[in-house]
Amino acid sequence: IIEAVKNALNPDAAEEAGMPFEQPDVLVIGAGMAGLTTAARAAELGLNVLIVDQAATYGGSANVAGGTLLGAGTRMQKEAGIEDDPDLCFADFVRLGGAGNFNEEIAREFAEISGEAVDWLDDLGTDFGDRVPYYGVYQPLNVARNYSGKGGARAFVVSLYAELEKYFSTNAYMMLNTYVTGLVTNDEGAVIGAKARLADGTETTLLAPATVICTGGYAGNEELLNKYNFENVLSTSPACVTGDGYAWLEELGAPLTNMDFCTAYAGGIPTSDDFRSFGYFNATNGALWINTNGERMANETGADSHVKSETWANAPHNIVYTVFSSEMLIPDAKVFSTGAWGSVKEEFDPYMESLIEKGLAWKADTVEELAEKVGLPVDTFAATIAAYNDGCANGNDPFGRTAQEVAMANGPFYAVK
């Protein structure tokens, strides 16, 4: 192993020291937040730890994630006068996740140790900003037990790496640019390490009594997203989040469960040919959501992000058209955003023209013409708009909508895919 690591040395580590042990006790695959947590804690406990990652840097998706943690009974809750315990935390898991939809034994263990884990990160000097727990944004918890790192999840990466770095001269080592190709098993079928390819193409085997797979999800893998979740999907995940660990475990006969569960935002517009690049269109007051059959699907103004996501997930081909008229445009709106904090103000007409040129938007003088341009069933779409307009006039929207009832009476009309 010592020879194998020479070409994959972490530039932030003490290069001159080399790997401080001949054989690791623990091999950690993946240097994102889970891997850094595992490696740092194992090193604290005195184990020899080798952590590897296919990327050129550590942190994984935590380098770009918003950075929210959950913990029950934490020091920060006590400081804020908030009473909480693992039972209340577990009750939230059942309420929000649905009994039977998750491994309750693991969830119970998570609830029991979550507060201690958050306090440990606090002890490491993590910058939690104002240190005020909160309920959550989309589906509020029963107790304020969410915490955010200042500046996002990168705050956690910084403190975890700093803790792990303390042990680089004694019992921890990191190999980046190291692509694991599969797991190694003994004659009894137990995992005893991994096969890996270094940056220079060298193939090697990394052995350890314990192997911990911390390769994260698969949100950067379009093939797996298409297979398990969505026919059409965009992602902001880093390219390194490929879900390789699932394939390794499946090869060994491990059952994969709940792979069809994926929390996703709705309404992305591609900004390049890379499926990991998209943004949102924001400039309307009460636009309609129309599926590929030319039909509405929900009360657009009464839907929270969860309902909106469900609407997109259940739409044919996961495609929805945001349809609106010029009367629905918000003057001086921030037309486009790349996330919750990335809204930008653009001139509407040039931006819309750019979408039209890319085949992502259409403009027409009549509802029927718009349907023809988009490729929607003309009669169905026209009837949908007529029913919406009747609802605006009579106060009886087909989906119970009572807000932002702006009739689509006059063109031009627009559709954004």
Task: Give the location of each predicted region.
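A glycine-rich dinucleotide-binding beta-alpha-beta segment and adjacent secondary-structure elements
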Residues: 182-184, 190, 380-417
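An anion/pyrophosphate-binding glycine-rich loop and adjacent beta-alpha core
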Residues: 246-248, 255-373
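Glycine-rich loop(s) and the adjacent beta-strand/alpha-helix scaffold that form part
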Residues: 199-202, 206-272
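N-terminal Rossmann-like FAD-binding beta1-loop-alpha1 element of flavoenzymes
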Residues: 24-51
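Helical element adjacent to the flavin cofactor pocket in flavoenzyme catalytic cores
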Residues: 148-204, 209, 246, 252
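N-terminal leader/propeptide and maturation segments of large enzyme subunits in energy/redox metabolism
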Residues: 98, 103-117, 125, 332-394
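Conserved N-terminal/central alpha/beta ligand/cofactor-binding core
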Residues: 18, 48, 54-57, 61-173, ...
